[in-house]
Amino acid sequence: MVRAVSLGDRIKLGMAIPQTFADTPVDMMVVRRVSQRAEELGFESLWTSEGTFSIRPNLEPVGLLNYVAGLTSTIRLGVSVLIFPLHSPVRLAKAFASLDQASNGRAIMGIGLGEKSAPYG
């Protein structure tokens, strides 16, 4: 059984949202249960990542966070990290501004250059 742990202001714990489902269809009920339970247990944040070139298909991170924003009310929502060279800066800014509005200011944006250099030539 999982129990909530209070660590005060010393440590803030976050967890990853399920984004990949090996050899099975995407199960949004799993995403729902994990997200809501993490909030109930007092986790500070939920995280997605962008794995555009991964072997397994995964859910688009900002769209997934918008879904989770509608299921939760206090937990922060972040991407660790978006592969910046693959995005239009204006569209990315708008997507995150929309997520931040939809979540009442809970969005956390992480950007980086990406995973490995091979996909970029």
How would you describe each model-predicted region?
Residues 1-71, 76:
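N-terminal beta1-alpha1-beta2 module of alpha/beta enzyme domains
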Residues 76-88:
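Structural motif corresponding to the early beta-alpha repeats
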Residues 7-26, 86-121:
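Flexible, glycine-rich active-site loops centered on histidine and acidic residues
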Residues 49, 80, 110-112:
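Structural motif
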Residues 52, 82, 114-116:
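Catalytic metal-binding/acid-base residues of hydrolase active sites
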